[in-house]
Amino acid sequence: MSAVFADTSFYLALLRGDDPVHSRALAELRAGHSIITTEFILLELGNACARATDHADFLALVAGLRASPRATIVPLGSQLLDQGMQLMGERQDKDWSLTDCISFIVMKERGIHDALTTDKHFEQAGFTTLLKQGAD
């Protein structure tokens, strides 16, 4: 099975049972994909889980990712950060976040076409979003 990129919205959907794509996120998790994500995504997720009541679930999710043979977490690094900022500068016509730009670079470098995300910016960058809302 080919690798997919996991974005912040995928992890939030897994953690929040009331999320509109929670069921689809669970189904994708159970599908057995090899998952690629970045420490930038985990940083963004950690910020989204800032409420004390979310800490345990966030930490458990990260521990599970680190332990999973199906998951690869691309580390933070100055070169990747610089590449993301360069792409952001090149695409000032788009409302892409720095984390989005870094994700796109990782996906292109690894030949990944599919993203576990609800974020339309991935489609703007030429990728397929597997959790597109309203796709049921």
Give the residues covered by each predicted segment:
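Active-site neighborhoods of divalent-metal-dependent phosphate/nucleic-acid chemistry enzymes
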Residues: 72-114
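Short, well-structured N-terminal submotif of metal-dependent ribonuclease cores
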Residues: 1-37, 50-63, 133-136
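Acidic, PIN/NYN-like endoribonuclease modules and their adjacent C-terminal/linker elements
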Residues: 104-105, 109-136
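Short loop->beta-strand "edge-of-pocket" segments that line small-molecule binding or catalytic clefts
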Residues: 34-36, 69-72
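Short amphipathic alpha-helical interaction patches enriched in hydrophobic/aromatic residues
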Residues: 12, 49, 69-70, 88-92
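Short secondary-structure boundary segments
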Residues: 39-41, 100, 119-120
